[in-house]
Amino acid sequence: VCSSDLDPGIEFGKLIGQDLEIFRRLDELHTLGFPILLAASRKTLVGNVLGGLPSSERLEGTAAVNTFAIARGARIIRVHDVRAMARVARMTEALIGMSVDGTPLERCRADGTIVDESELLPSGE
């Protein structure tokens, strides 16, 4: 079962600049000792930074946010596009040498159970 986490609350009562500052300082939050949960998938922040894109066109922005967050210590990422973002996470892990602290990312369901990597792959991969 996944442990307790720290969610910085992207877009909850903050301005865009404040949310961007949270992203830039995720590595500091990581030092508190809790897995960081990030939920920025398709957020308005992503759409606004990319020129007002609708949520259906925010995949690339979400991928960039998640890559940056993983590199800065986020360990739990809530997403809409699970397979695409699992691939982004896997590639990011490879680029940064698995993970910042040597542990694999936790991929959790809403009920707290950990998702098996094989569940994220299409049949035959």
Language-model segment annotations:
Residues V1-S3:
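Short, small-residue-biased leader/transition segments that mark boundaries at the very start
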Residues G9:
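Conserved phosphate/ATP/ADP-binding segment of small-molecule kinases
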